[in-house]
Amino acid sequence: MAELTTIARPYAKAAFDVAVEHNAVDTWAEMLTFAALVSENETMQPLLTGSLASTKLAALFISVCGEQINEQGQNLIKVMAENGRLKVLPAVSELFAQYRNEWAKEVEADVVSAAELSSEQKQQISNSLEKRLARKVKLNCSTDAALIAGVIIKAGDLVIDGSVRGKLSRLSEKLQS
């Protein structure tokens, strides 16, 4: 994964710089998300790793994407095809989203709880994270009964494990040492 990120980073950064310059960050995010989905398609996978000439591969990829990709996006696809990098489009899209969130002072937080959270609880978590991170927070909530009770919050590098399962695990480690 780290290798894919290293390969994808210059493409994502270049795309982000162009998007900011042309005030089209959301448009680029949509284009890259769509292109990433196309590159992950099981029909497209063999073509990306095959021996098809880069110009033909780029033309095929662009025709599959149709009007979902503008001229600047098509140029990115052509450059990536020339360098044999179309298979890293999902990583480019992911990095672009990270750059976008950083630029917009936003962060996505994954919240896993033992039971469904009420809208009031979600708002409390969101407000607390916004204060702590000094960013606008978008919550992605899910449930996992294995937590027993409590929540686990992941926002960027920050991980807060307030679950009973986590507390039991830490207690067990202390007792064994």
From Swiss-Prot:
Compartments where located:
Cell inner membrane
Q: Which Gene3D superfamilies match?
A: N-terminal domain of the delta subunit of the F1F0-ATP synthase (1.10.520.20)
Membrane topology is: Peripheral membrane protein
Coiled-coil region(s): none
Show the InterPro entries listed in the entry: ATP_synth_OSCP/delta_N_sf, ATPase_OSCP/d_CS, ATPase_OSCP/dsu
Question: One GO term of the cellular component aspect?
Answer: plasma membrane
**Sorted alphabetically, which keywords does the UniProt record give?**
ATP synthesis, Cell inner membrane, Cell membrane, CF(1), Hydrogen ion transport, Ion transport, Membrane, Transport
* Phosphoprotein in keyword set: no
Instruction: Just give the chief location class.
Output: membrane
Q: Name one GO molecular function term.
A: proton-transporting ATP synthase activity, rotational mechanism
Q: Which PROSITE patterns match?
A: ATPASE_DELTA
Question: What biological function has been recorded for the protein in this entry?
Answer: F(1)F(0) ATP synthase produces ATP from ADP in the presence of a proton or sodium gradient. F-type ATPases consist of two structural domains, F(1) containing the extramembraneous catalytic core and F(0) containing the membrane proton channel, linked together by a central stalk and a peripheral stalk. During catalysis, ATP synthesis in the catalytic domain of F(1) is coupled via a rotary mechanism of the central stalk subunits to proton translocation.
- Could you say which protein family the record assigns here? Belongs to the ATPase delta chain family.
Its quaternary organisation is: F-type ATPases have 2 components, F(1) - the catalytic core - and F(0) - the membrane proton channel. F(1) has five subunits: alpha(3), beta(3), gamma(1), delta(1), epsilon(1). F(0) has three main subunits: a(1), b(2) and c(10-14). The alpha and beta chains form an alternating ring which encloses part of the gamma chain. F(1) is attached to F(0) by a central stalk formed by the gamma and epsilon chains, while a peripheral stalk is formed by the delta and b chains.
Q: Output the HAMAP family linked to this UniProt entry.
A: ATP_synth_delta_bact
Tell me the protein's name. ATP synthase subunit delta
